[in-house]
């Protein structure tokens, strides 16, 4: 009987903890995107990826930071139009919403690398912020690779 009561108590406690966890972070996926900026800075220069929503599509733009006439300016390097639903699917496949709060410290004994700064507003006002230096969240490399792939496919057409 004592084992039975202990088992019921453990099950009840586990259930309550699980319910609290579910209520704490109810949005584990991106359902809408309002804005996104990804800045990559390395020895070769700085690239800035931005999105802008145009009707039912999302316009992805990549800018290159250049120094001109005494100031840094962003020059449009490439742009592509994609379906907003497809872009949201990419964000979910790469678990972008879980990046929030990520800060990737530069690994010891790594002499170079790319620094990134990511900000997105999703789901009607939820902000995702992540940054790092040669240390990235899970899904980051796939996300950047897919952004570049979208831009390259558009340049080919």
Regions inferred by a protein language model and the residue ranges of each:
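Post-signal-peptide N-terminal segment of Sec-exported extracytoplasmic proteins
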Residues: 41-69
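A short-motif feature that recognizes glycine-rich, charge-decorated loops
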Residues: 62-99
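Positively charged n-region of N-terminal signal peptides that target proteins for export
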Residues: 1-4
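Short, well-ordered, aromatic-rich surface patches in folded extracellular/luminal domains
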Residues: 24-46, 93-94, 100-157
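A short, structured loop/turn motif at beta-sheet edges
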Residues: 53-56, 81-89, 120-126
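Conserved, charge-rich beta-strand/loop surface module that forms ligand/interface-binding patches
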Residues: 25-31, 48, 73-82
């Amino acid at each position: 009987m004592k084992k039975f009561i202990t088992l019921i108590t453990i099950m009840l406690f586990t259930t309550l903890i699980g319910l609290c966890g579910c209520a704490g972070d109810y949005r584990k996926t991106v359902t809408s995107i309002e804005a996104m900026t990804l800045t990559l800075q390395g020895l070769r220069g700085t690239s800035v990826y931005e999105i802008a929503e145009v009707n039912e599509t999302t316009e992805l733009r990549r800018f290159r930071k250049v120094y001109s006439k005494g100031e840094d300016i962003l020059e449009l390097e490439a742009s592509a139009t994609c379906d907003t639903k497809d872009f949201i699917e990419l964000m979910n496949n790469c678990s972008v919403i879980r990046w929030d709060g990520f800060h990737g410290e530069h690994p010891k004994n790594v002499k170079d690398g790319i620094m990134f700064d990511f900000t997105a507003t999703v789901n009607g006002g939820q902000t995702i912020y992540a940054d790092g230096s040669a240390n990235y969240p899970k899904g980051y490399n796939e996300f950047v690779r897919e952004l570049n792939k979208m831009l390259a496919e558009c340049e080919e057409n």
